[in-house]
Amino acid sequence: FFYGDWAKVDANTYALVYWDYGNGGYLTTFDINDDASTISTKKSRHRFTQSTSTNDGRFSDILELGSNMFVVAYEDNSNRGIIKTFTISDDGSTVTEKDFEYLISSSSNSYMEWNSMVKVDNNTVAIAHSGAVNAAEGWITTFNVDPSTGVISGASGSSNKYVNRLKHDNVLGKYNSLVKLGGDKYVLAYSGSGEDGFITSFTISDDG
């Protein structure tokens, strides 16, 4: 069990994504009662990766977009960054895949690691990740998700699946934690040069 991340589905249902080393990436849903004394599994080990290859599913992160639509980011066995969308029923018993895209490139070793996503507006997502050169460098990348269909898209008229990209650190961008402060203001905590900790703030427009 590595890279676990939670999202809330409804008042007492939660989704957990994680990487099972050598077996792929999985999504499991749980019901947790009001006083947290009872935890019951609703959907067990739904595999969200394309394969069960050794490294498929690393750096998994899940985000609730709204109206039962969820976004999962991860890296596959060929070191490619992948975005997938799913619907999850309110009771957590049904998980349905909607779309799958290589965010940066379908070429091997394009890298998208240490992922942390936030919702920008109802159809735009920002992700902090490392990438490009041997999984180094710190990046912020934005992309669109149709909230009703789950279709992932980039800037209008572009073949890319991302809207925009910003390299904020030329050396390193690991252990990312990206949060929205409010309005168009965002703050990122991450590990950079020398494994030192850094905090950087950004503005991101609603359209990414």
For each feature predicted by the language model, list its residue ranges.
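Extracellular, repeat-based ectodomains that mediate carbohydrate processing or recognition
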Residues: F1-G208
